[in-house]
């Protein structure tokens, strides 16, 4: 269990099961975080700007953070109430997953705002990280609320008011029509993202795939990174190949309740060990 203390408008968190900032913030889960230098990261989530770092003793430092913001945003965002040690012990019943978990120590699932996450992964289709971040930056700068020095991610309602001509400024190509369709379905209530947290993973996936351009991979990213479905397992070509090499294509049974965490570990492990896929 983590502990937190507040001092000089900063929050200092001791996380017994660790947090690795580069491998959590810059691994393709979220796209609005950047390293400023000297291990300090900054970004925007839930309309709030945050700077943070991990200190020499492993303490996670959140700067200029109120107790209210920590309790209402960052505690859940960084998944601090989940016992990753216990999860890793269960995964470690499989020797390959044990190695992957050890390699990936400190990677955590980010619990993000659902609309932002869905929209971001629509943008991510057939795209690279640099370009994804560029499109999202233009989306926020042009349509997000000005918070004084930074912009919040625009609401689905704001985007639903736009035309495809309005969205041309994003330079997002074919993705613009998918962004607009998603915004319209969310803002109208046709798809209720909050409700999807309470239904089965399969049912939630089917609902998200009613949006134009949303296939299983984009849906599973939204489910895992924003809708509390820790058993969602996003699959792209690369992870499918890694799964085939490591497990013959089928995730071991002990991993299935935590498939999303296992997916992050497998991806990182395969990349870092230069697994031939």
Where are the predicted features?
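HhH-family (HhH-GPD) DNA N-glycosylase catalytic core used in base-excision repair
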Residues: 1-277
